[in-house]
A protein has these predicted regions:
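Structural micro-motif
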Residues: 49-61
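Glycine-/small-residue-rich active-site loops that bind phosphorylated ligands and cofactors
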Residues: 13-14, 40, 73
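Short acidic, gly/pro-rich beta-turn/loop elements at beta-sheet edges
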Residues: 17, 58, 69
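Thiol-based oxidoreductase modules, predominantly thioredoxin-like and allied folds used
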Residues: 8-10, 29-44
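Local sequence-structure signature of Cys/Sec-based thiol-disulfide redox active-site neighborhoods
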Residues: 1-29
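Short, aromatic/basic amphipathic alpha-helical patches
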Residues: 22-24, 47-51
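Non-catalytic, surface beta->alpha helical segment in thiol-disulfide oxidoreductase systems
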Residues: 61-91
Length: 91
């Protein structure tokens, strides 16, 4: 099942690292969207508020899982991986 992965960045080195980690580890069916928190875009502002993004990098999966910072685990799409995220990082 494809997932929506949203990454909130601030242009920092760690943010770029997270984007690269997720880009390499996600499957071809998952949708990746990257948002710059410094943007004046209304969609970005609303998503930041909705997900309570107060630090970057932050990864939100399917609107119900949030990982803040650089993950200390490998990012590989798969059912077991998303169960792990859901168990440990639910919003």
């Amino acid at each position: 099942m494809p997932h929506l992965i949203e990454i909130f960045t601030g242009g920092c080195t760690l943010c770029r690292k997270v984007v690269n980690i997720v880009t390499v580890g996600k499957c071809k069916d998952c949708v990746l969207r990257v948002f710059d928190v410094d943007s004046d875009d209304e969609e970005v502002r609303m998503k930041r508020e909705h997900y309570n993004i107060t630090a970057v990098p932050a990864i939100v999966v399917d609107g119900r899982i949030k990982v803040v910072g650089v993950p200390d685990f490998p990012w590989f799409c798969g059912d077991d991986f998303y169960r792990f995220l859901d168990k440990n990082f639910s919003l």
